[in-house]
Amino acid sequence: MSKLILIRHGQSLWNAANKFTGWVDIPLSRRGRAEAMIAASKLQEQGYRIDVCFTSLLIRAMETAIIALTEYEQLCGGKTPIFKHDADDLDWHGWDKYDGDPKEELPIFPSQALDERYYGDLQGLNKAQTAQKYGSEQVHEWRRSYFTRPPGGESLEDTQKRVIPYFENRILTHIAHGDTVMVAAHGNSLRAMIMRLENLQPEDVPNLELATGIPLIYEVDQQAKVSNKIVLH
């Protein structure tokens, strides 16, 4: 059995300000950095050892991953975390022509496919003020519905269409090899993945809540069929 560890990034500065963030590249707050460290501490205490990590291209997810893997060295078996960029990602410069040493290094693969849902015209707006303007039911539908797009943005269905192919083609490959895989990403990109893992339907999505910095561990077979689920509160 392989283990798949999902972590929503720690609290960001705009989480703290109750703003829609989406693709705006906002860093972690002080609390968010602490959440990343606490999550790593819990994983290490339970004896988990990460073989490979995936993140989005957004700094709050990458910060969460790198804090976890550098502050608690036993979590990655004493290996050095190293970001491995893909040529199809926007931040790839062509300079990291380095294959690496799997005995000494733990690869972190950042990908735009795992980015947060794009909130379009809502990005940067305060959620409470937006609810006052448009109504709480409308804002809740924009945030939690599977099919409804916020103005100029993505629905969760749209998000899932980019997350799942990446999961199937990249993440599942490591699961099939028996690796312990960590994914540090976002509420909606992780919801898309959880729908695949737990065979959830669109009507189940509104009740699917993910707290920042709380590890969610799945024990899975080579096809990512889940046999056990653990939440490390």
Curated annotation (Swiss-Prot):
Transmembrane segments: none annotated. It catalyses: (2R)-2-phosphoglycerate = (2R)-3-phosphoglycerate. InterPro entries: His_Pase_superF_clade-1, His_PPase_superfam, PG/BPGM_mutase_AS, Phosphogly_mut1. Substrate binds at residues 8-15, 21-22, 60, 116-119, 127, 143-144, 187-188. Pathway: Carbohydrate degradation; glycolysis; pyruvate from D-glyceraldehyde 3-phosphate: step 3/5. The active site is at 9 (tele-phosphohistidine intermediate), 116 (proton donor/acceptor). GO terms for molecular function: phosphoglycerate mutase activity. The keyword Isomerase applies. The record marks 186 as: Transition state stabilizer. Keywords: Gluconeogenesis, Glycolysis, Isomerase. Its EC number is 5.4.2.11. GO terms for biological process: gluconeogenesis; glycolytic process. It holds the Pfam family His_Phos_1. Gene3D superfamilies: Phosphoglycerate mutase-like. Belongs to the phosphoglycerate mutase family. BPG-dependent PGAM subfamily. HAMAP family: PGAM_GpmA. Catalyzes the interconversion of 2-phosphoglycerate and 3-phosphoglycerate. This is 2,3-bisphosphoglycerate-dependent phosphoglycerate mutase. It comes from Gloeothece citriformis (strain PCC 7424) (Cyanothece sp. (strain PCC 7424)).
